Amino acid sequence: MTNIRKTHPLIKIINHSFIDLPAPSNISAWWNFGSLLGICLIIQILTGLFLAMHYTSDTMTAFSSVTHICRDVNYGWLIRYMHANGASMFFICLFLHVGRGLYYGSYTYFETWNIGVILLFAVMATAFMGYVLPWGQMSFWGATVITNLLSAIPYIGTTLVEWIWGGFSVDKATLTRFFAFHFILPFIITALVMVHLLFLHETGSNNPSGLISDSDKIPFHPYYTIKDILGVLLLILILMILVLFSPDLLGDPDNYTPANPLNTPPHIKPEWYFLFAYAILRSIPNKLGGVLALVLSILILMLFPILHMSKQRSMMFRPLSQCMFWILVADLFTLTWIGGQPVEYPFIIIGQLASILYFMIILLILPTISLFENKLLKW
């Protein structure tokens, strides 16, 4: 009798994706982040579902309903902080996952890569709308500032902003629709994840050397299931330390003040994971220019397959490119720091220099160094 795992129409798909999947024998811990992102998504959907049972998307009661969840609902505080800090863990894993892709040249699987970039946009949109829901000061002013950026679009800008707001300012209609979108987007993300995996399994995984590994494959289970479980345990450990010991470490104190349209907070800033993009936005004095730079800072990831000039796929054997890659990482840390600082000297000029360097490294320096490395190796 044939194993049901290999014959059943539904179980067969799971088998080919997670059990009998041929995987390279040398993939490192950097390949754990895909499964960790899957776990993050599951945690976010489950905690979000339980929060939605008690949350009300009305300007008069939204803030109170979040307070009610934390005070009166059984383990409501735990669910709420797991959801808030789960988002931070999600973005840490996302950034590391993208960084891994850049370092090891995984972007040469361009369908998988492009869907990954679309996923990044979708997760960022979801996180932004989620931040608006508690209806604190930073929720309200963050929503006002970020949605207002669309007014920079010529001709249709103002109409578009009012259409998104559902009125002439961020109000009840805005909150209600943001809640609706925040609820539906994770399911769209889940569907996109399946497409992402579908394209990945067409080609098979990349590996640290960047070489074809068809001659040396091992089954995913038990080797990488065990390895992934270790990653998951570490993820949950870090998340729970964050949730139970310092749940507000990554949040903004201003969000514990109910939204007040008549009182602007001294420093409007988004959550930490958007600060690098926010710094790029602020570094350009022109509104439309800033918005374009903001979008391009993420969209530029789609250009990596075109900008790849090296004869080698991975950066494993390219020390000059490695050096530039880590300078890019340091630059992103600098941008994140600048995004959280007030708009004054010397932060303005540091932000502008870091923004220029970000685009310069990706568009000019990395491709040039790759060509130089080809010459060094007489290729």
UniProtKB/Swiss-Prot annotation:
Chain positions recorded as heme b b566 binding sites: H97, H196
Matching Pfam families: Cytochrom_B_C (PF00032), Cytochrome_B (PF00033)
Domain of life, per lineage: Eukaryota
Binding positions (a ubiquinone): H201
Main location (coarse class): mitochondrion
SUPFAM superfamilies: a domain/subunit of cytochrome bc1 complex (Ubiquinol-cytochrome c reductase), Transmembrane di-heme cytochromes
Keyword Iron: yes
CDD domains: cytochrome_b_C, Cytochrome_b_N
The keyword Heme belongs to this UniProt entry's keyword annotation: yes
Molecular function GO labels: metal ion binding; ubiquinol-cytochrome-c reductase activity
Transmembrane segments: 33-53, 77-98, 113-133, 178-198, 226-246, 288-308, 320-340, 347-367
Cofactor: heme b
GO BP, sorted A to Z: mitochondrial electron transport, ubiquinol to cytochrome c
UniProt keyword list: Electron transport, Heme, Iron, Membrane, Metal-binding, Mitochondrion, Mitochondrion inner membrane, Respiratory chain, Transmembrane, Transmembrane helix, Transport, Ubiquinone
Record note on cofactor: Binds 2 heme b groups non-covalently.
Membrane topology: Multi-pass membrane protein
Subunit structure: The cytochrome bc1 complex contains 11 subunits: 3 respiratory subunits (MT-CYB, CYC1 and UQCRFS1), 2 core proteins (UQCRC1 and UQCRC2) and 6 low-molecular weight proteins (UQCRH/QCR6, UQCRB/QCR7, UQCRQ/QCR8, UQCR10/QCR9, UQCR11/QCR10 and a cleavage product of UQCRFS1). This cytochrome bc1 complex then forms a dimer.
PANTHER family documented for this protein: CYTOCHROME B
Protein family (similarity comment): Belongs to the cytochrome b family.
Its biological purpose: Component of the ubiquinol-cytochrome c reductase complex (complex III or cytochrome b-c1 complex) that is part of the mitochondrial respiratory chain. The b-c1 complex mediates electron transfer from ubiquinol to cytochrome c. Contributes to the generation of a proton gradient across the mitochondrial membrane that is then used for ATP synthesis.
Protein name, as recorded: Cytochrome b
Organism encoding this protein: Neotamias siskiyou (Siskiyou chipmunk)
Gene (name only): MT-CYB
